[in-house]
Amino acid sequence: MSKLLGSEILGENIKRLRLSCGLTQEQTVARLQILGSPLSRSTYSLIEMGRGNIFVNDLVGLQRVFNVSYEEFFKDIPPSRSSKESTP
């Protein structure tokens, strides 16, 4: 399974989306588990704090739970630069 690297901004965006839906972490995780995700609340909490990695399938689940576009998750995250681009 593919993972997305942890990011503080990604975590903040996930938290913002959860709160805008009026959900607690427990409610969000319960909905993800109904969709087949084995994600625990403690792991979800780490993701929101930008200290944990998220599986792509869990991001897909969050998109369904929050009913938002994928762009909302990556809002305000600057594009990464490859090492080739940063070398003079």
Predicted regions and their residues:
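Short alpha-helical DNA-recognition segment
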Residues: G22-L46
